[in-house]
Design a protein with these regions (language model features):
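Walker B catalytic acidic pair
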Residues: 191
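Active-site-proximal or metal-binding-adjacent scaffold patches in catalytic folds
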Residues: 1-186, 195-232
């Protein structure tokens, strides 16, 4: 099994797992292609699977590209709106403030002199608040799912919302805190259930549904609108 696999004009990162029983294709929000497969799967098997899914792959790639193009670039000026837990708050640049960024009275407030580092400041603020919020939600839903994660971490996961580490660590993208609370809860439950099931099997989705009976609507919302929230 090679670490990468190219089939015609499609290049994939191959992610083997000794616990995986099925092959799964993923088109990340940036168009990056991954194929997850049981460890030791022959490249010819993966190639045949990809060829069978070619039409679906091209549809997904086109959709991701159109969603990325629709995202407007943010400017760190007074009046610009920035999302937090599904709501948009306007930025106000101020002349004096003791912290780089704070949300107060319905506005993000940032020292005017710090605007040049606005992206880094916002990401740090989002990551700090995401960790607190996500740890609370993980505690809430872990009992429903029947698992106990080792720890919760927030980091830059690129174009992934979350991941479940082998040691029981749940990793979440700092950008999850931009989404509406109900959608973040779906991301949390999704990763918690991965502590039971590596693969997206029928049993996996049954466990998700037991914790979130309306998960299908949340999942669809995330697929259709989530990319538009990564704006800084």
């Amino acid at each position: 099994m090679s670490p990468t696999l190219t089939v015609d004009d499609l290049a994939f990162e191959v992610l083997p797992s000794p616990r995986r029983k099925t092959v799964e294709l993923t088109v990340e929000r940036d168009g990056h292609l991954t194929i997850r497969a049981p460890e030791g799967t022959d490249d010819s098997v993966l190639t045949a699977f990809i060829q069978e899914k070619r039409f679906w792959l091209y549809q997904k790639i086109a959709l991701k590209n159109s969603m990325r193009q629709a995202v407007a670039t943010k400017e760190f000026v007074s009046g610009e709106g920035f999302p937090y837990l599904g709501r948009s708050y306007r930025l106000l640049l101020v002349d004096g403030q003791d912290v780089p960024l704070k949300l107060e009275a319905g506005r993000f407030r940032m020292p005017r002199a710090a605007a040049g580092n606005g992206r880094e400041i916002f990401i740090a603020w989002y990551a700090e608040h995401a960790l607190v919020w996500l740890r609370n939600r993980v505690r809430l839903f872990a009992s429903r799912v029947g698992v106990e994660p080792a720890r919760v971490e927030v980091r830059d996961l690129g174009f992934r919302w979350g991941s479940c580490g082998r040691a029981g660590t749940l990793n979440f993208n700092w950008a999850t805190i931009l989404l509406p609370p109900a959608i973040v809860e779906y991301v949390v439950v999704h990763e918690l259930v991965h502590l039971h099931e590596d693969n997206h099997t029928p049993e996996f989705w049954q466990r998700v549904e037991r914790a979130l009976p309306d998960y299908k609507q949340r999942k669809q919302w995330l697929a259709e609108k989530g990319a538009g929230y990564v704006v800084v």
